Regions:
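Catalytic-core regions of glycoside hydrolase
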Residues: 1-167
Length: 168
């Protein structure tokens, strides 16, 4: 992936010298690159897709949704990636509110199993690595969701968590 991304960023920077491109550390590409170094303008986007969201990342023994990868292993992969990519430009893409995921990519969707304490703990964990940029999906949280479940307070929790978020 990084070889291809390096070619893309070189082409983009011919048009826009300030162009940025994410290296998506996700699923099969979550291990840190070891042979290829990123070109200027490539930043880390860490997306621990197979983690579990009923326990915080700091619970290193928690086993992810794949039944084998622990949160400790996800954190090790994050640490390894941060040896290649600077924390200052790194971004986390997490799935705390991704109802498409929780619903198995089928509608009608289920209610988001929101764990505010897990979310806030995860923010602290990411902050401890110096990561300043946090994003999340909220797919399937739509008009049907609001009509069916009513409570979308997790969106406010997410916003307040980010408002108060500070990288360390």
């Amino acid at each position: 992936g990084l070889i291809f991304e390096n070619h893309i960023i070189k082409a983009l920077r011919k048009i826009d010298p300030e162009a940025q491109l994410a290296h998506l550390a996700y699923h099969n590409s979550i291990e840190a690159p070891s042979c290829v170094k990123p070109e200027e303008g490539i930043f880390l986007e860490f997306a621990p897709f197979f983690r579990t969201w009923d326990q915080p990342l700091k619970n290193r023994d928690a086993v992810g949704r794949d039944g084998k990868t622990t949160h400790g292993e996800f954190l090790r992969m994050l640490e390894d990636n941060l040896k290649v990519f600077p924390a200052e430009t790194a971004q986390v893409l997490d799935y705390w509110m991704d109802d498409s995921l929780y619903s198995g990519w089928k509608k009608p969707q289920v209610q988001v199993p929101w764990h505010r304490d897990v979310f806030l703990s995860d923010l602290e964990t990411y902050a401890s690595y110096g990561i300043r940029n946090i994003t999340a999906y909220a797919i399937y949280v739509d008009d049907y969701y609001v009509k069916t479940f009513g409570d979308i307070s997790f969106v406010d929790d997410y916003g307040q968590g980010l408002l108060n978020y500070r990288a360390k």
